[in-house]
């Protein structure tokens, strides 16, 4: 899983959740 800049939170968590 890639926990980085997703925004959507589909891959892992996502750091930036707008």
Swiss-Prot record:
Q: Does the keyword Magnesium apply?
A: no
GO biological process entries: glycolytic process
Keyword flag Translocase = no
Q: Which UniProt keywords apply?
A: Cytoplasm, Glycolysis, NAD, Oxidoreductase
Q: What is the lineage of its organism?
A: Eukaryota, Discoba, Heterolobosea, Tetramitia, Eutetramitia
Name the protein family: Belongs to the glyceraldehyde-3-phosphate dehydrogenase family.
Q: Which reaction does it catalyse?
A: D-glyceraldehyde 3-phosphate + phosphate + NAD(+) = (2R)-3-phospho-glyceroyl phosphate + NADH + H(+)
What would you give as a GO molecular function for this chain, any one? glyceraldehyde-3-phosphate dehydrogenase (NAD+) (phosphorylating) activity
The record, for InterPro entries, names: NAD(P)-bd_dom_sf
**Where does this protein come from, organism-wise?**
Naegleria fowleri (Brain eating amoeba)
Q: What class of enzyme is it?
A: oxidoreductase
Q: What is this protein called?
A: Glyceraldehyde-3-phosphate dehydrogenase
Q: Which EC numbers does the record give? A: 1.2.1.12
